[in-house]
Every structure is written in structure tokens, then in C-alpha cells.
Amino acid sequence: MPPPEVATLLTGLAMGESPRWHQNRLWFSDWGAQEIVALDLDGNREVVVRTAFGLPFCIDWLPDGRLLVVSGRESLLLRREPDDRW
């Protein structure tokens, strides 16, 4: 069996962390840029959230689809509402 093919998906990240697959996109936190980014199957990058708080350590979703973010500096668990409020 041949080895799996390795490909670079994205460059230019400060520090990518907490990858999650959600709604057919790869989501992750870029700690250094203080962003939450989504990458689709065609390689299109979207900055979904630019955080006003500290480092977006980890992300996940509630069953109803609301985004959860752990903010490292403040030691907070934040929930993003449908109207983009935290």
C-alpha cells in the first residue's frame, strides 16, 4: 500500500490550534492573530471571528449550533449568539 499523500492546506498562520470539522469546513483558532478561521474543501479561508478578547484557545459547538470559545488570558468560556453577541 502506498503511503498517504501529504499536502499543505494553508500557510501564514501565527499558531493554528484546536482543529474541528464542522459544517463541511475545517475550523481552527489562530492564537497569534486572535482569529477563528474556517477552511472549506476548495481551500478558501474565511476569518469567522476576530476576537476582541485574549487568545482563542479552543472552539466547539453546542447542539444548537452556537460557537463556544475558551479565552485563555481571561480564563473564560464564551458563547457566541446568533446575532454575533458574546
Each model region followed by its residue ranges:
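Blade/loop signatures of beta-propeller domains
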Residues: M1-P4, N24, A33, L39
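Beta-rich, blade/repeat-based domains predominating
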Residues: L9-R25, T51-S71
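Short linear S-[DN]-x-LW-Φ motif typified by the pepsin-like aspartic protease active-site region
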Residues: S18, S29-W31, V47
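Hydrophobic residues embedded in beta-strands of well-ordered beta-sheets
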Residues: L26, I36, R45-E46, L67, ...
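Short loop/turn segments immediately following the C-termini of beta-strands
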Residues: W31, G72-R73
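Structural signal for beta-propeller blades
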Residues: Q34-V37, S75-L78
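Short loop/turn segments that connect beta-strands within beta-propeller blades
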Residues: D40-N44, R80-D84
